[in-house]
Amino acid sequence: MHTVFLGDYIKTRRLELGLTQEELCEGICEPITISRLENGRQTPSRNNINALLQRLGLPGDRYFALLSKQEQQIELLKKEIISCNVRHQSAAAPERSAILKETYEKIAALEALADGDDHLLRQFLLRTKVHLGREDGEPYSLDEKLEMLLAAIRLTVPKFDLEEIDQHLYCMDEIKVINQIANLYMEMGQNRKATAIFRQLLKYIQKHYQNIQESAGHLPLVASNYALALYKCRYYEEALEIAEQGRQSCVKFGYYGSLPNLLHTMAQCRFQLGDEEGSKALFYQAYYLYRATDGPRGAALLQEDARECWGISFAY
């Protein structure tokens, strides 16, 4: 096995991209930390190392590190919070309050472990709260959500500008925040604004994440949301093109979480373009993928769309 010193690995890639230490570490750690890393005198936390590698477009699966007890607790709590968040979104009303309480208890435990200068962790907590809403169960307003998400991305990218997304480097968690921002604009009815953000975001992923297996789900996710925004703007052919890119990425990397959404949007676009055979086939494919992946909400929405477009009624 060929072994490469981590500091050299990062420095070589940084210089290939023409980046200064300050540009690479902005919002994650201090330049002196990068200098010490490259010289072998210090190793940052695994969370920070992963973020730096992702910003450089490098895979993190070749890097291994021992975790401190605190880092182990933080990683475990993050996974539990993500799991609770997913359960909360799909739970029936009677269960949601109990899950919400459980999640905020875990958030409080995580906040107690967090260092004040751990911007990545604070960012994670902010975007999680946007999904969850307040502790009393009341959702944040759309304007409040936007304010929270912009604050979250600017924790690690202080000069972030929605008009010039490609002027900075991003780790995968930062990509998720920007994706949330674009989705929020779509929810506000500002679909053209959303498409402008998704267009930049997809281009960034295609350029920087070619070598990162861990990012396999990001391109289909962004392509799915981008295609939906284009559909809402009535750019049906462009929406089909973007959705097809997402579909191909799902097949290539074996990541199918966004596939039913992509096929759903493609079915609607085909309907608008008068392609009855193609549209019906895609509706059926999307419906049974929703069923297979336990997506009841998506399946219900698709049933309505299929019935409205073609009078299709799914028996199973």
At which residue positions do the language-model features occur?
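Helix-turn-helix repeat elements of alpha-solenoid scaffolds
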Residues: H88-E111, E138-F160, N191-Y204, R234-E244, ...
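Short alpha-helical DNA-recognition segment
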Residues: L15-R36
